[in-house]
């Protein structure tokens, strides 16, 4: 008997091929998919409309992604942060945020991260491995079952670079938006990237109706390379044209993420440079007051400075908003809870 497959990783088409390969009718695949991704079961024995012989086969050949909540923190504003332990013992973070329009879950896509952004806690120990499609989906299901509340929006902005785990993330998006599952529409999904240009072009060809959020954080190469080593491989001269191509190909407006760092990227000169860089794109800029990270040389810009920067951008014709800060009284920085757990705090 070979290694078991994680049945949660299979898209409906892949699951159908697998079930038919077991000599079962196609409709069984749709039933099983619903058990996994709509009813959110984590045991084959819970699939009460399936033949016992098939369940025995599945039990023998397959597993179901079912992370365990290792730590749970709840903020005064209702934000819930989870440290989830995977089947192999690795841990990831997932955050549920409550808004007036519904609940958003921020998912991780890798265990650790290889991108090395210097203001981010999740990259400090490097990348361990990619998450599978089913493991990413299970983050949402775990939060939904824990709170008893429906999740309506997803942001792929947790630990890891989604486009560095491209194929698994594409399968996850297909699973999560499938009408036979939790059926979260693409327009309710945001995917964040630090700027892997070839993968942005590959994503554009898929014409998905999600929102692409590009972690920009600086409007010139010198500053950006100091904050984000990925800029050495894909400088702004490559990244911004890729963003323009993406908008043209998909018809979807890009959002630029801009973490405000005191004395680094928060001056009026930087606002002018940023406006010039993205001129004519009609893009949205999301200004983010950074969370403090142990061991990082960076500190957050004060609120007055953030709002001054926002007003300067708007005066220059750039649509800019300040991200609402949630979970500030818990280990809110991405990767911080996982790091604290590893250090035994």
Label each PLM-derived region with a short phrase.
Residues 124-153:
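Conserved alpha-helical substructure of the radical SAM core
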Residues 144-320:
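Conserved AdoMet/S-adenosylmethionine-binding subsite of the radical SAM
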Residues 98-135:
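Canonical Radical SAM [4Fe-4S] cluster-binding loop centered on the CxxxCxxC motif
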Residues 88-102:
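P-loop NTP-binding catalytic core
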Residues 1-92, 244-253, 258-345:
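Auxiliary Fe-S-binding modules of radical SAM enzymes
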Residues 80, 92, 103-107, 115, ...:
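Generic beta-strand structural signal
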Residues 75, 108-109, 122, 192, ...:
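Short linear Ser/Thr-Pro motifs
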């Amino acid at each position: 008997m070979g290694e078991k497959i994680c049945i949660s990783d299979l898209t409906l088409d892949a699951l159908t091929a697998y079930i038919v390969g077991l000599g079962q009718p196609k409709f069984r695949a749709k039933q099983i998919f619903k058990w996994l991704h709509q009813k959110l079961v984590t045991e084959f024995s819970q699939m009460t409309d399936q033949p016992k012989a098939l369940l025995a086969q599945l039990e023998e050949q397959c597993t179901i992604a079912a992370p365990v909540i290792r730590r749970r923190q709840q903020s005064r504003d209702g934000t819930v942060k989870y440290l989830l332990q995977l089947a192999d013992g690795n841990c990831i973070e997932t955050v549920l945020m409550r808004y007036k329009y519904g609940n958003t879950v921020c998912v991780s896509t890798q265990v650790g991260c290889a991108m090395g952004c210097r203001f981010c806690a999740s990259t400090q120990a490097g990348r361990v491995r990619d998450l599978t499609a089913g493991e990413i989906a299970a983050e949402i299901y775990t939060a939904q079952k824990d709170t008893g509340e429906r999740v309506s929006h997803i942001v792929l902005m947790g630990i890891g670079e989604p486009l560095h785990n491209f194929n698994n993330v594409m399968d996850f998006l297909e699973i999560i938006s499938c009408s036979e599952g939790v059926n979260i529409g693409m327009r309710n999904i945001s995917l964040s990237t630090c700027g892997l240009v070839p993968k942005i072009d590959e994503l554009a060809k898929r014409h998905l109706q999600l929102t692409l959020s590009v972690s920009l954080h600086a409007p010139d190469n010198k500053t950006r390379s100091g904050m984000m080593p990925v800029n050495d491989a894909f400088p702004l001269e490559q990244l911004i044209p890729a963003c323009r191509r993406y908008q043209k190909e998909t018809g979807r407006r890009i959002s630029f993420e801009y973490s405000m760092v005191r004395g680094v990227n928060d001056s009026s000169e930087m606002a002018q440079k940023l406006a010039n860089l993205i001129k004519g794109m009609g893009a949205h800029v999301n200004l983010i007051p950074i969370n403090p990270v142990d061991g990082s040389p960076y500190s957050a810009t004060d609120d007055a400075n953030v709002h001054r920067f926002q007003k300067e951008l708007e005066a220059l014709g750039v649509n800019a908003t300040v991200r609402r800060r949630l979970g500030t009284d818990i280990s809110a920085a991405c990767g911080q809870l996982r790091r604290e757990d590893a250090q035994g705090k």
